[in-house]
Amino acid sequence: MTYTSGALTAATQSFNLTHGPAAQLSITTQASGATNGAVFTVQPVVEIQDQDGNRVTTGSQATQNVVVSASSETIAGGTSQAAVGGVATFSGVKLTGTVGTITLTYTITSPTSKTKTQTIALVAGAPTQLIVKTAAATCQSRIACTTQP
C-alpha cells in the first residue's frame, strides 16, 4: 500500500492478506451421472471458503474432512474426504436405491457445522435379473395354461 500527501515523500507498507475461518462450502464440480449401483461419472469437488468466498488454504480447517450424505438412498464409496488446501476431491461415490431426484448434502464441522446441498438424478442401471412373479399352472399340451405367467 502506498500513502501520499501533497509534497511529502510517499510511504509504502507491505502486508499479506489471509483468508478468514471456514464459513461456507462451494461445490466447484457437481456430482453427475448417477446410475443405480454405479459410481458417479463425474465425482464432486467441494471447496472450503471463508465468509467472503476465499478458499481456506491453511490450518486445520483447510484439511478437515468433508462428508457427503444422501437424502433417502444408500450412498457408498469415498463419502468422507480430507480436504487438501481447502479442496475435497471425492472418488468412488455411488448411490443405490429407488430412482428419482436425490439431494446430496456436503458437511464440514470446523469451526462450526456448515452444509451445502445439490440435487442429482438417480437413473436405473442395466437389468441384472428376470423375476417370474406368477408361475404358469395347470398346463396341458395344446391347451392354454389356466394360470398364465
Label each residue range with its predicted role.
Residues 1-5, 101-109:
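Short, aromatic- and glycine-rich surface loops/edge beta-strands on solvent-exposed regions
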Residues 77-88:
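Short, acidic Ser/Thr/Gly-rich low-complexity loop/linker segments typical of extracellular
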